[in-house]
Amino acid sequence: MKYELTATEARVIGCLLEKQVTTPEQYPLSVNGVVTACNQKTNREPVMNLTEQEVQEQLDNLVKRHFLRTVSGFGNRVTKYEQRFCNSEFGDLKLSAAEVALVTTLLLRGAQTPGELRSRASRMHEFSDMAEVESTLERLASREDGPYVIRLAREPGKRESRYMHLFCGDVDELSLQTSAPESASGDLQSRVEALESEVAELKQRLDSLLAHLGE
């Protein structure tokens, strides 16, 4: 597989994929928009504190690798960025809406169980049941042009195995186990995180609207 992203590149692409679906009226994103999305406190693991310069460097690298493209011209006072990572006109990677939702959530949050993924990805795609989540993960794991995700060995005392994306190369399962946050009542925690993320998104929309009205 030709995808060897750094953790920061994965964060940038994940943010653009997320905002393309959840806030299409703000997409494509400016550099400042990408910085804000990357450093969100909700629906991000780990939480990052990237500077504008660091984000600009990542954007420039991803444009050179044809994973992003710049959008400027009439009506755009600042350069904006849109993803060409998947489902672009000339790109090879084609994903369904369900696959985009899961890949995005894995890029933003790292290894997660199907239950966590269903809850956290719900704002991008409404999965009808757990079977749809699991079948989508299996498709991503068995694609001829992939695999794009891997099922990790189930940890002792856990009911579900976690899944991890492979866009940053092979997975070190031992380091993932030692760095995995302890989840108390996983489904409830996921619902709370989803609500917090929705509130943050609404605040961002309101700020954008107020700024627009003030122009």
From Swiss-Prot:
Q: Which Pfam families match?
A: DUF480
Q: Indicate the family of this protein.
A: Belongs to the UPF0502 family.
Q: What is this protein called?
A: UPF0502 protein YceH
Task: Write down the species.
Answer: Salmonella schwarzengrund (strain CVM19633)
Whichever gene encodes this chain, its name is yceH
